Structures are given as C-alpha cells and as structure tokens.
C-alpha cells in the first residue's frame, strides 16, 4: 500500500522544488503534497513573516490529513519539523530529514553556520525593505549546487525568492521533539558542499536513534536528480 508524503521545503525555495520527487514517488504508487510556506510565492508580501508562521502552516496541513503521513523536511525545514511534529504527533507515521539542519535546544540556524555567513546575511536583510535575505547567486552555484550543470543552476535560481530572516534567527526548543516516539530516518545526499564535511550528519546525532540512507548528489539533488532522492525515500520507509 502506498504512503502519503508531506514535503516541507527550506529557505528561499517553494513547494515546487519537490515536484520531480513527487512524480517519481507517484510512479511507485505513493501520493504526496508539498505546501509552499508563507511568503515563498512570487510577489508575496514578506514583511512581518515570523518563525511561527512556518510552524503554523505545517500544523494546518497536518490537521487536514485523514491518516498518519510521512513528513519530510529539507535543509532549513529540518528544525521546522522539530517544532511542528510535537504539535501533531498523531498525524505523523514517520519523519524523514533530507540534508537538514537539526538544531540543539535554544539554538537558531545562524548559531550553526559560519559567523561571517550569518553576519553577511543579516546585513543584507537589514538593507532590504522587508527584512529578507536576497538570493545569493554565488552561494547557490558554488555551495548549494556545487558540481551541478549551469543550466540546472540557472533554473533553480530563477525560481528562488528572498528569505524572511526570522527563519534563520529564531531559537527553537527541542524538549517536546526529543520525547516523540515517531520513527526517524535521514536521507543524506553525500556530495553536499553547502556545509563542511560531516556537518549534516553531525547535527543528525541530535535525533537520537535514526536510520541513515545515503544517496549521491548535491544539496539540491531533490531538484537536479529527483529519482535518486525518491529512491532513497522509498528505502527509508517503515512499514
């Protein structure tokens, strides 16, 4: 019997980044949806977007599910899952983290990135009209999509939107998350150059007991090589 997946995107992205993965999963008899977070549609008013707006969006999607689903988060969505999952544990059959930020209690994403990166993004957001971090093309090409074809880089960059900085600066609490008994898996694209080697799997130690599935690809392999990511997700499924 097929599973139903709910995919949560990370910073700058929208639900569209999961389209290729969803198509691959549907070929295998699964169903899926990928909501776009507040402020992440083109033309959205991003001023005033708060961290809780993201969490509330996820919990509202979960509330509409008729039966438990597989909840998947990529990149910055990792810590959104840490905050949202405890609010709707009965709606979640399994949690899967894909090259995701897993934060310690009381920390924000900016606490786990190089200080110069956090400082540069903060300055850029302060200079913007809506407190957003603009799309940083060099970062996308040389870290998020290192080694990917230029045409794929261009395609992704054309769809990214400015990121409300609250996602990066808000500390989370993990007390409720660490008490969950939901099975957890990590699907890790092992060619990811967006952080130093070992950083993502190091953060994943905060998940406790989890299953690790490694696949090939960059941080953006969900967009550039969705078949490989879908295969990893299927391998990770708990029946």
Where are these regions (language model features)?
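Conserved HGGG/HGGXW glycine-rich cap/lid loop of the alpha/beta-hydrolase fold
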Residues: 3-44, 69
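Gly/Ala-rich beta-loop-alpha elbow adjacent to hydrolase catalytic centers
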Residues: 72-77, 81
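Flexible "cap/lid" loop of the alpha/beta hydrolase fold
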Residues: 86, 90-129, 133, 167-168, ...
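Active-site nucleophile elbow and catalytic-triad environment of alpha/beta-hydrolase enzymes
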Residues: 158-177
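Short beta-strand/loop motif that positions the catalytic acidic residue
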Residues: 180, 186-188
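The conserved beta1-alpha1 loop
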Residues: 6-10, 74, 188
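Conserved loop-alpha-helix segment in the C-terminal half of the alpha/beta-hydrolase fold
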Residues: 190-223, 236
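Active-site loop/oxyanion-hole signature of alpha/beta-hydrolase fold enzymes
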Residues: 31, 37-70, 86, 110-114
């Amino acid at each position: 019997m097929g599973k139903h997946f709910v995919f949560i995107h990370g910073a700058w992205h929208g639900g569209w980044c999961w389209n290729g993965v969803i198509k691959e999963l549907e070929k295998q008899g699964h169903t899926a949806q990928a909501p776009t977070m507040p402020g992440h549609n083109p033309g959205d008013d991003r001023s005033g977007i708060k961290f809780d707006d993201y969490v509330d969006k996820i919990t509202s999607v979960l509330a509409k599910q008729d039966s438990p689903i597989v909840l998947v988060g990529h990149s910055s969505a990792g810590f959104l899952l840490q905050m949202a999952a405890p609010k709707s544990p009965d709606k979640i059959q399994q949690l899967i983290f894909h090259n995701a930020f897993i934060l310690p209690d009381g920390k924000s994403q900016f606490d786990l990135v190089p200080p110069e990166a956090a400082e540069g993004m903060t300055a850029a957001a302060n200079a913007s009209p809506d407190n957003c971090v603009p799309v940083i093309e060099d970062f996308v090409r040389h870290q998020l999509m290192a080694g990917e074809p230029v045409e794929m880089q261009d395609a992704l960059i054309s769809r990214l939107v400015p990121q409300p900085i609250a996602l990066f600066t808000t500390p989370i609490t993990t007390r409720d998350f660490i008490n969950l008994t939901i099975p957890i898996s990590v699907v890790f694209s092992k060619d990811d150059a967006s952080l130093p080697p070992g950083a993502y799997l190091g953060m994943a130690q905060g998940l406790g007991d989890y299953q690790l599935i490694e696949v090939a690809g960059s941080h953006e392999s969900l967009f550039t090589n969705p078949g490989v990511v879908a295969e990893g997700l299927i391998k990770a499924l708990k029946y």
